[in-house]
Amino acid sequence: MGINWNYPTTMWIGENRIEDLSLACKELNISNPLFVTDKDLINLDLIKNIILRLKKSFKNLATFSNFTGNPIGENVEEGVKVYNTSTCDGVIALGGGSGLDVGKAIAFMCNQSRPLWDFEDIGDYWTRADSSKISKIIAVPTTAGTGSETGRASAIINKETGAKKIIFHPKMLPSIVILDPLLTLDLSPRLTAATGMDALAHNLEAFCAPGYHPMADGIAMEGIKLIKNSLIKAFKNGKDIDARMDLLSAASMGSTAFQKGLGAIHSLSHPVNGKFNVHHGLSNAIFMPYVLTFNKSTIENKIISICDYLNLNKSFESFLDWILELRNNLNIPHKLSDVMDCNNIDLEKLSLMAFEDPSTGGNPKKLNQNDLKEIYLKSISGELFK
């Protein structure tokens, strides 16, 4: 049995570590970085101050921010043009999942001869890339959700099909990660909830995924516990620095752990994100109890095994009740139909997209297209599997 274990990169953690950004560039021999963040962040005073500090070290600092949530392939192509015309030699990716994913994809694609979609996470497609031409990446998350800072992939939407594609290469893992909780203090309660549930989905699906990976299991368990202890605290008091640090850590841990696998929560979410622009963390939160109850026969013993660690009664029902209570306390809608118009959606097409998503193969219970369609129907009606 041959299994490769890949774990995080260099991580600089703590308050005010953002002030070490120029030092991080120096350590990686980056002399002309491209600063990537989304258009919602670029005009914030916090980000303006970061850019001003960087310009003291890099007078001709180039920036790219022409994208928002759920980025598309064209955003990456435009960023690559900025990178190359500015003769950059590295990327600083700052933001939530979108900013990190776009920045990583730009660093990956800046010198490749093949189109982006040729590197989708299918089989050995990643070997098509010229790994010697992938630029160094520094990742700075401003939300605690996707954990893209410790991931080796980017989620990018193919505008023509509406499908969210995973672009993968081992060298897309950032070389230095800066986790500074001060950058997350002004995150709204709504985004704190959605991104926190995204991190929970990563840790939970990694823990439940089939296969032998005790290192990932241990990291995922602690990630779930950090979220259980701190998500409500940060939701109620955004300035709780310890809770914010816990959530940043849990997000990075989730992305680290899910190399073991993801499952139906993510494969159901990706089509909804791509076709209807629903926030990824929010859709993960909505689908979570429906997928848990669908998978119950396969994961019940696994779930019971962590209940003691989470100070829950030792039963699947106790864990499910915690998830439902957590969602309620975070004002997460119970049904998919609460966040989008489900009256005229093509469930056949949506369930086929979910079935073809790479995450489906990591679900602990084998799935077919009809299973995924049934979970969609349950999430629309609000009825959990018995």
Where does each model-flagged region fall?
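C-terminal charged capping/lid subdomain of soluble metabolic enzymes
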Residues: 303, 307, 313-386
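N-terminal amphipathic/basic leader segments beginning at the initiator methionine
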Residues: 1-28
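Glycine-rich phosphate/diphosphate-binding loops that line cofactor/substrate pockets in enzymes
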Residues: 19-34, 52-57, 85
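Glycine/threonine-rich beta-strand-loop-alpha-helix active-site module
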Residues: 74-181
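C-terminal catalytic subdomain
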Residues: 262-315
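N-terminal small/polar loop signature for handling phosphorylated ligands or for N-terminal nucleophile
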Residues: 42-115, 233-244
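Carboxylate- and glycine-rich phosphate/diphosphate-binding segment that chelates Mg2+/Mn2+
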Residues: 152-260, 370
